[in-house]
């Protein structure tokens, strides 16, 4: 299960860093964006904020684990894991679920990545629900078992 962030800051103040500096997850760079991807539990650590206070924010995608499928020929498919995102304006856009990015400060943000639910291996029982994924106050609910 992948869980990622696009991290950026704005402005040209030379006293402070132009962009947010952060650690955690697998980090990739695309233009002025740093993307932190978590495939398991971890910590997104903001070590330095960018320019003017309040101008720092992160775009986010939080995906929960899907539900496991039901057993036997009549077993239903598991439900998809929940999905939440928010973004800043620019070349990277997100769905209309949230039209604004999340402001961050110089602190640690624990990351929980929800796993998929186990499928049923026998006739009758449902597959297990998927687990929630969490970033700060954003929670995506795990999918229901089939």
Regions found by a protein language model. Give the residues of each.
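Glycine-biased low-complexity/repetitive sequence motifs
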Residues: 1-146
């Amino acid at each position: 299960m992948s869980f990622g962030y696009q991290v950026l800051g704005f402005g040209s103040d030379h006293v402070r860093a132009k962009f947010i500096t952060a650690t955690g997850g697998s980090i990739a760079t695309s233009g002025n964006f740093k993307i932190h991807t978590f495939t398991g539990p971890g910590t997104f650590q903001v070590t330095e904020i960018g320019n003017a206070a309040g101008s720092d924010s992160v775009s986010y995608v939080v995906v929960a684990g899907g539900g496991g499928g039901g057993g036997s020929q009549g077993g239903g498919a598991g439900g998809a894991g929940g999905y939440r995102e928010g973004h800043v304006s620019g070349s990277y856009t997100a769905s209309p679920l949230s039209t604004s990015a999340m402001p961050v400060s110089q602190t640690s943000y624990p990351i929980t990545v929800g796993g998929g639910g186990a499928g049923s291996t026998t006739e009758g029982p449902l597959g297990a629900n998927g687990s929630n994924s969490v970033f700060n106050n954003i929670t995506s609910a795990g999918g229901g078992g089939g």
